[in-house]
A protein has these predicted regions:
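Short acidic/histidine-rich motifs immediately flanking catalytic phosphotransfer sites
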Residues: 50-53, 71-76, 97
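N-terminal Rossmann-fold cofactor-binding loop
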Residues: 36-40, 60-61
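ADP-ribose/adenylate-binding Rossmann-like module
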Residues: 83, 92-110
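Conserved Rossmann-fold cofactor-binding substructure of NAD(P)-dependent oxidoreductases
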Residues: 58-87
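N-terminal Rossmann NAD(P)H-binding glycine-rich loop of SDR-like oxidoreductase domains
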Residues: 6-27
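Short beta-strand element of Class I
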Residues: 32-34
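Structural motif
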Residues: 6, 75-76, 101
Length: 110
């Protein structure tokens, strides 16, 4: 099955997520990506703030099934949603199950 997106940026409403969203939009205009997180209203605000021409996707970091659906739509999940000790395990599990590459920005050492 072909993925709908090349990258989904999960946690795009936070400080680092916004930097990533802005960077993608300014430097990779042909990239097929989406912005995702827990709050549709906040995602739409970021989309408007940076004039992003991308889809917004909602998935709660505590909901494995929602994360599976999210991971199943892309080649790569880039997560900027922390704390990673709380939110990364289920996302990693969803990515493994869907055959999706995963990366995050954690500096946490636990």
């Amino acid at each position: 099955m072909e993925n709908k997106y090349e990258i989904i940026l999960y946690g795009g409403t936070g400080f680092t997520g916004q930097l990533c969203a802005k960077y993608f939009s300014e430097n990779y205009p042909e990239l097929n990506w989406a912005i995702a997180g827990r709050n549709k209203k906040k995602l739409d605000e970021i989309k408007e703030k940076f004039n992003l021409k991308v889809d917004t996707l909602v998935a709660d970091g505590d909901n494995l099934e929602a994360l599976r659906v999210l991971a199943g739509q892309t080649k790569v999940i880039l997560s900027t949603a922390g704390p990673f000790a709380r939110y990364s395990d289920l996302m990693v599990q969803a990515c493994v199950e869907q055959g999706t590459h995963y990366t995050d920005i954690t500096g946490e050492n636990h």
